[in-house]
Curated annotation (Swiss-Prot):
Belongs to the MinE family. One of its GO terms (biological process) is regulation of division septum assembly. This is Cell division topological specificity factor. It comes from the Bacteria. The lineage of its organism: Bacteria, Pseudomonadati, Pseudomonadota, Gammaproteobacteria, Lysobacterales. Gene3D superfamilies: Cell division topological specificity factor MinE.
């Protein structure tokens, strides 16, 4: 019976892979320090600004700054000179 019990009690590989992936995702989120929506927010802000002003993709920067108990959303937009608009 020892061999049958050994084979029967095995953790499924899909479950193991899922658990490992969840750990990796949690570690990456804590290392980044920011929520997942920041890249999407940056792209959407860029699209809205492009409707009115011609700017490059790297002209919009979005950062989340932790200031004690508060989170501050820092949005920086580098606008072109008047001649380039």
């Amino acid at each position: 019976m020892g061999l049958i019990d050994f084979l029967r009690n095995k953790t499924k590989t899909a479950e193991t892979a899922k658990n490992r992936l969840q750990i990796i995702i949690a570690q990456e989120r804590t290392q980044r320090g920011g929520p997942d929506y920041l890249p999407l927010l940056q792209r959407e802000l860029l699209e809205v600004i492009k409707k009115y002003v011609k700017i490059d993709a790297d002209a919009v920067k979005v950062d989340l700054i932790k200031d004690g108990a508060n989170d501050v959303l820092d949005i920086s937009v580098a606008l072109p000179d008047d001649s380039e608009r």
